[in-house]
Amino acid sequence: MSDAVHTGWQLSEQAPLRALNTFHVEATARWLLNVHAPEALPQALAAPEIAGQPLLVLGSGSNVLLAGDPPGCVLCFDNRQTSIIAHRADHAIVRAGAGVNWHALVLYSLQQGLSGLENLALIPGTVGACPIQNIGAYGAQVGDFIHVVEAFDRHSQQFVRLDAADCAFGYRDSVFKQQPERYLIVAVEFNLPLLHELRLDYAGIREELARMGAELAGAADVAQAVINIRRRKLPDPDVLGNAGSFFKNPLLPSEQIAALQASFADMPVYPGEQAGQGKLSAAWLIEQCGWKGRREGDAGVSPEHALVLVNYGTATGAQLLDFARRIAESVRERYSVILEPEPRIIGAHW
C-alpha cells in the first residue's frame, strides 16, 4: 500500500478494508481517501487518480456488506469535532463532524443535559452515516432530531445545508440513501431538547429500568437501559463480526396484515409509519423459519437475535450474502413477505 499525504487529506493505494467494516470481511480498495478537513474535499476529489471514479463512503463500516472489492475509491472522514453552537431556552443545537463516533455523541449530549438521543445509544457507526439510514431503535429515529445536514453536493460541486424536510426522512430511508452518489455528508447539526418525553414503551425498557431501580427515570437512565439490553441481545462487532440488524421490519398494507393474521394468529404486528399500514417483526419471521442460531461454515445467525447475521471468523462477504438471500427466500416462501436488507450491499446485487 502506497500513501500520498496532502494538506487535509491522504490518498492510499491498494488499501485493505477488513478493519474498516464490522463484518470483518476481506476486501481491498483500489484507492482509499481519508479526509481530515472537509474544506479540502473538492481538492481531494479532483486528484487525478480518483477524479470521476465511483465513491463509497465508509464511516465505521457498520452498515455495509462488502460482497466484493468496491469499485473506484473508498472515502473516510476523520473530522471528529463536537460542539454546542446555539443555546435556546428549551433546547440546544449540537454540531458533530461526520467522523464522530455515534455512541460518543449520544454520551456527549447526555453529559450536556440534553435529551432525545438516549434510545439510540450504542448503535455502531459514525455521525456522518446516521442520516443516510435514518437510524432508529427502541421507538426513536434520528431524523426527528436532525436540524441540518451539511454536505458536499457532487452535482453542483458546492457545500450545501439540508434541513430535515430536504432530507426526506422515512423508515430507514432518506434522500442520501435514495441518491447515494450525490451527497457527501461532512457534519450534522442536531436540535436536542433540555426536557423530552421519554420513550419507555418499547422492547423491555420499562422492565430494564425496574431492574436498575430507576423508578424516576431520566434520559441517562433510559440510555443505560438501552445499553444493557443491546449488550445482552447483540454481539459486540469487535468480538464477532456483524452489522447489527440485517433485515428491515416489513411494512405492509393493513389488508395484507389481516390476511396473514388469519393464517398465523400468533404473528406479532406493530403500528406502521402511516395510516393503513402495519409493521411485522422480521426477527419473528426468521425465527419461525428456523434460522435463529443456524451456522454454515463461518456464516450464521446469532443465537440471541434472529435479525443479526454474523461472521464467526473467515466467512467472505459473498458467503454472507448468499446466506442472507436464502433466509429471505424461506420467509417469502412461507409468508409471502419480502425481506429487505438494512446494510448497503457492495460488490454484488441483492
Curated annotation (Swiss-Prot):
SUPFAM superfamilies the UniProt entry points to: FAD-binding/transporter-associated domain-like, Uridine diphospho-N-Acetylenolpyruvylglucosamine reductase, MurB, C-terminal domain
Protein name from the UniProt record: UDP-N-acetylenolpyruvoylglucosamine reductase
Family: Belongs to the MurB family.
Source species, domain of life: Bacteria
InterPro entries attached to this UniProt entry: FAD-bd_PCMH, FAD-bd_PCMH-like_sf, FAD-bd_PCMH_sub1, FAD-bd_PCMH_sub2, MurB, MurB_C, MurB_C_sf, Oxid_FAD_bind_N
PANTHER family the record matches: UDP-N-ACETYLENOLPYRUVOYLGLUCOSAMINE REDUCTASE
Cofactor names: FAD
GO biological process, any: cell division
NCBIfam families: murB, PRK00046.1, PRK13903.1
Record organism: Xanthomonas euvesicatoria pv. vesicatoria (strain 85-10) (Xanthomonas campestris pv. vesicatoria)
Subcellular location per the Swiss-Prot or TrEMBL entry: Cytoplasm
Enzyme type, top EC level: oxidoreductase
Function: Cell wall formation.
Cystines in this chain: none
